[in-house]
Regions:
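Conserved acetyl-CoA-binding loop-helix of GNAT-fold acetyltransferases
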Residues: 79-95
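Active-site beta-strand termini and strand-to-loop segments that position acidic
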Residues: 54-56, 64, 140-143
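Conserved GNAT acetyl-CoA-binding A-motif
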Residues: 96-107
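Short amphipathic alpha-helix that is part of the acyltransferase structural core
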Residues: 1-36, 142
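Conserved active-site alpha-helix within GNAT-family acetyltransferase domains
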Residues: 107-125
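A short helix-loop-beta-strand connector motif used in the catalytic cores of GNAT acetyltransferases and
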Residues: 39-58
């Protein structure tokens, strides 16, 4: 467990942006109300349903679906280069915590590219979103 915590703490202290600012930025980009997002996250974390890991200015928010499987969401204010490093760190922490698979749906086609650059195996399937726009369903192998 100490290894997981050590990996999660890996970040450049001088460049740290407060977690709430990262979440505020994510809410703004997605067009959702920050107070609602923050309240939902607080409730889900308190219930044990949701957890957050951080590396640099990237947050990995994940819901535990079943043992070893999590639904993943990334919120970041890192540059693309730092995002690749953060994603590597976060998936290494998930691996050490015993996760084998992560799943997510995103409208950002660049996430698959980031995973590829970070050497994290992912199956990508393009699907039609609720608004008729393309979305990407990713199944990520953590181990």
């Amino acid at each position: 467990m100490a290894d997981v915590m050590q990996t999660m703490r890996k970040q450049t202290v001088a460049d740290d942006i407060p977690m709430l600012d990262i979440l505020r930025n994510e809410a703004k980009q997605r067009g959702v109300n920050f107070s609602n997002l923050h309240g939902m996250l607080k409730s889900d974390i308190k219930s044990g349903k949701t957890r957050i890991m951080r590396s640099g200015n990237t947050l990995l928010i994940y819901d535990i679906l079943q043992p070893g499987v999590a639904e993943l969401h990334i919120a970041t204010m890192d540059s693309p280069e730092k995002l690749v490093v953060a994603v590597k760190d976060l998936f290494e922490a998930m691996k050490k915590a015993g996760y084998k698979k992560g799943v997510t749906v995103t409208d950002n086609s660049q996430i698959a590219r980031v995973l590829n650059v970070a050497n994290i195996p992912a199956a990508v399937q393009q699907i039609l979103g609720k608004d008729g726009k393309a979305e990407y369903q990713l199944t990520i192998q953590v181990q």
